[in-house]
Amino acid sequence: ATDPPSDLAVIKVDPNGLSTVALGNSDQLSVGEWVVAIGSPFGLHLNHTVTAGIVSAIGRSSVMSRNNFEDFIQHDAAINPGNSGGALFNLDGELVGINTAIATDGYSRANAGVGFAIPINMVKRVMEDLISDGKVTRGWLGVQIQDVDEGMAKALQLNGWNGAIISQVIKNSPAEDAGVEKQDVIIAVNGVKVDDSSNLKNLISSGRPHDKTKLTLIRDGHEKKLTVTLGIRPGEKELAETYRYGEKLFDILGLRV
């Protein structure tokens, strides 16, 4: 079973003679912490290659596609084409991520010290759904969102650039039912700070349908708290029909949540 939006899949193998790896908690990773990558760069003749590095950043998004669900661990352990799907371990031997991509200078496919791994906590969530249902069911708010820039921050009386601006509220959506309005700026979900629109997308989609979710937002310069009951996130084709926007306008305005 596969989940293209997260770039993850679950396969069934014969377990005879195999032991399972210990799964860590990627939420406990810190910038500067040592990690170890294992994979097969440039083909199977280099299989079981082990490299080491440190966590450079956490919560990276919009690396591969704004339409995907991304919350990457950025690290500098050497990974290259062929490492995708390989393990990222902490120094306790716990699996904390799945290596999936690298950033390059645009001229070479070789490692430049900027690698990205899917955090194991996201992997667990996707894995559980794929095994039980064959698909991933994500929470849905029913809004169109965009990042906060300097001009919008001034216009909406914000103290900083954190958060995500509501540019559209879908009719009869969970957001509308909860009282979310256009030009609200969501700054936290269940007490977790929202950095930008991609971060909000991840926080909402990591919830389950029917979850009671607390939103902290700024409206007319004042902080307000709302509780929303998440819906079931539609498929991409259904989303396109629901939001009634062409792709060109969608690219300008931001993300669907």
Regions found by a protein language model. Give the residues of each.
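Short, conserved beta-turn/loop elements at beta-strand boundaries and strand-helix junctions
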Residues: 2-6, 57-63, 148-150, 233-235
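Conserved catalytic-core segment of clan PA serine endopeptidases
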Residues: 1-16, 23-27, 205-207, 218
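Active-site loop architecture of trypsin-fold serine endopeptidases
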Residues: 18-20, 38-53, 59-85, 90-134, ...
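Short glycine/Trp-rich loop-beta-loop segment that forms part of the substrate-binding cleft
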Residues: 6, 24-46
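C-terminal recognition in membrane/secretory proteostasis and scaffolding
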Residues: 12, 30, 95, 125-257
